[in-house]
UniProtKB/Swiss-Prot annotation:
GO biological-process terms attached to the record: transcription by RNA polymerase II
Name of the protein this chain belongs to: Protein SPT3
Gene: SPT3
Lineage: Eukaryota, Fungi, Dikarya, Ascomycota, Saccharomycotina
Localization per Swiss-Prot or TrEMBL: Nucleus
Main location: nucleus
Entry superkingdom: Eukaryota
Amino acid sequence: MSDKYKYRVEIQQMMFVSGENNEPPVETTSLIEDIVRGQVVEILLQATRTANCRGSKSIVPEDVIFLIRHDKAKVNRLRTYLSWKDLRKNAKDQDAQQAAAGGGAGDGSGPGGIDDDDAGKKDKDGAGVNMKVKKSSIKLPWELQFMFNEQPLENPDEDDMDDDEREANMATLKRLKMADDRTRGMTKEEYVHWSDCRQASFTFRKSKRFKDWSGISQLIDSKPHDDVIDILGFLTFEIVCAITETALKIKTRYERIRSMKTQSQPQEYSVGTTRRKKRLFDGPDNVVNPLKPEHIEEAWRVLQTVNMKHRALSNYKGGRLSSRTVIM
């Protein structure tokens, strides 16, 4: 089992960020890891079919993003994640180039008569412009603007948001509000642990382990793009968070139903107190209840439910809706 399940620690950290304060049992993390692996395999298979439809054997980032295009908030979060990744990469490259140029420049006054301060200022301004352009350069080919031959000019000062960006910002603000509520009463050590858990990833500095774990070499013919691996790392984090948040809601509902049944049981009355009559095999009163496999299985069933908007199409297909794994 230790060879099959390799991400127990990372899944525990992601579950902690999503609201699970108790340490989940091995069965729970193993089930989540199996679900995540199945989702990764399904993403790769569907992305391969999408790439084949456009006459290519290699998967590009747009093939993966196309599979989640209906979740506007997630797509915008992913685009922001990729743009900041490119921004950091370009900043490192520019720093390396500036360091190499500075090492061979000698003193401040060169043959062109330009001081180091002026040159540094120009380099800084140029780097800022390049990074700003690079950050906003991610475009998706199925967007409305690609249906026209001529594209509108981009205005860097224009800061208008469309409905998709507003939806993504609202979802991001809700997540930040939940994170703020959870971390408000934390000590410094607890917040450091929280920050470390937020950096948990299936792929960051674990690319080889992730490829062996998911079996990418058996699923696709060509070598995957680096951005594809990063996107899969982003989506695996989102999948674990979605499963955990849904499972916590299901656990709360189960506990509410159990408490209602408990209240309907006969009570033992004494002077000044009212308590439920204890049975022979009743457990302790204050027991820690982490997420169990049944909570994860029910959360998986809920998340795999087909939306009514898409289910209505079965009326025109003889009433039978073909079952297919939903990518979370």
